[in-house]
């Protein structure tokens, strides 16, 4: 049986067995690579690059030079996130959500593309439209935050990342043109491999309320997922899930793997669709090793919802 047929059968069986519940989906970076956003652990991911140096939450908070390094890199790399469009994975999940087949989406991604899917999925880089990446009626929990918002580390002032990008470019005229031309330096989560001279030349934008430092409103490496989010999402899996469907994630970080462990312990079926092995393969009820998560989801939606698979590649609102 084709992967889409296998997945459709799994979802239909779980739905019939667990009436009153719905599929809870956990998505990772493999759902967004087809939107042109690099990942960390894939075959061409960031961890395979020799020049990769991890920026941790602890480094960012204690070292002002690390803050300059982060924002220099982010200023140059944000264009991969700002204006990014959804791919077939996001659009198919939106259709599944509208149909009721998917009850909730938990995402490790910070790109906001699950929000954008509710607006038709077409990228929009205009500053006044940043809300398309941060706000929607999608039943969505962003485990690691959203790159399209920033927060002051001192007073908690909240600001759109698009506004900060504009102010960074005003504060650093010519910076983007001088240092941001090499696409091969693009990294995951709107990051960029900036040369040392770019970091040294970087002028930060400070909080307009207290003159404090801004931090992206995301969970950095070494930082914990906020406890209220963990508690709410664990309860959601326990009380609402007919099954747990993991898409495009290797499950290497515990903040994602915890849901697979929980589902397994509660007898909730687990399916994994990913390119390559994952941490949860040994306890999954179904594992599909695929080249394209988006293609499999589009074909699965065709089988279950009767929508032509080609529709999900057109990035428009799907009428069910």
Curated annotation (Swiss-Prot):
Pfam families: SIR2 (PF02146)
EC number: 2.3.1.286
Residues engaged in binding NAD(+): 28-48, 108-111, 248-250, 274-276, 294
Cellular localization per UniProt: Mitochondrion matrix
Keywords: Metal-binding, Mitochondrion, NAD, Transferase, Transit peptide, Zinc
Binding-site list for Zn(2+): 152, 155, 207, 210
Catalytic residues as annotated in Swiss-Prot or TrEMBL: 144
Any single GO CC term annotated in Swiss-Prot or TrEMBL for this entry: mitochondrial matrix
Transit peptide, from-to: 1-22
Cofactor stoichiometry and binding remark: Binds 1 zinc ion per subunit.
Domain of life: Eukaryota
Signal peptide: none
Domain Deacetylase sirtuin-type: 23-320
SUPFAM superfamilies hit by this protein: DHS-like NAD/FAD-binding domain
Catalytic activity reported: N(6)-acetyl-L-lysyl-[protein] + NAD(+) + H2O = 2''-O-acetyl-ADP-D-ribose + nicotinamide + L-lysyl-[protein]
Cofactors required: Zn(2+)
Molecular function GO labels: histone deacetylase activity, NAD-dependent; NAD+ binding; zinc ion binding
Role of this protein: NAD-dependent protein deacylase. Catalyzes the NAD-dependent hydrolysis of acyl groups from lysine residues.
Family, as annotated: Belongs to the sirtuin family. Class II subfamily.
Annotated protein name in UniProt: NAD-dependent protein deacylase SIR2rp2
């Amino acid at each position: 049986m084709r992967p889409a047929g296998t997945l459709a059968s799994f979802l239909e069986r779980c739905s019939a067995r667990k009436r009153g519940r719905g599929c809870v989906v956990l998505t990772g970076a493999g759902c967004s690579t087809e939107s042109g956003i690099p990942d960390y652990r894939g075959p061409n991911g960031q961890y395979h690059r020799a020049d990769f140096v991890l920026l941790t939450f602890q480094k960012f908070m204690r070292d002002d030079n690390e803050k300059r390094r982060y924002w220099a890199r982010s200023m140059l790399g944000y264009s991969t996130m700002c204006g990014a469009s959804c791919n077939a994975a996001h659009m198919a999940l939106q259709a599944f959500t509208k149909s009721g087949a998917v009850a909730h989406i938990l995402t490790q991604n910070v790109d906001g593309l699950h929000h954008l899917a509710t607006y038709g999925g077409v990228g929009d880089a205009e500053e006044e439209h940043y809300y398309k990446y941060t706000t929607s009626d999608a039943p969505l929990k962003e485990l690691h935050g959203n790159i399209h918002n920033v927060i002051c580390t001192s007073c908690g002032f909240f600001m759109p990342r698009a506004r900060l990008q504009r102010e960074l470019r005003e504060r650093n005229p010519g910076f983007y043109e001088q240092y941001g031309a090499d696409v091969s330096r693009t990294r995951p989560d709107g990051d960029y491999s900036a040369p040392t001279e770019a970091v040294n030349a970087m002028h930060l934008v400070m909080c307009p309320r207290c003159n404090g430092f801004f931090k992206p409103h995301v969970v950095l490496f070494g930082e914990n997922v906020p406890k209220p989010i963990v508690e709410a999402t664990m309860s959601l899996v326990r009380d609402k899930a007919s099954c747990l469907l993991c898409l495009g994630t290797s499950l290497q970080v515990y903040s994602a793997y915890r849901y697979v462990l929980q589902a397994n312990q509660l007898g909730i079926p687990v399916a994994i669709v990913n390119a390559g092995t994952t941490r949860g393969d040994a306890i999954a009820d179904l594992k599909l090793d695929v080249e394209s998560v988006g293609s499999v989801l589009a074909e699965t939606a065709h089988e279950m919802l009767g929508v032509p698979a080609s529709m999900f590649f057109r990035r428009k609102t799907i009428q069910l």
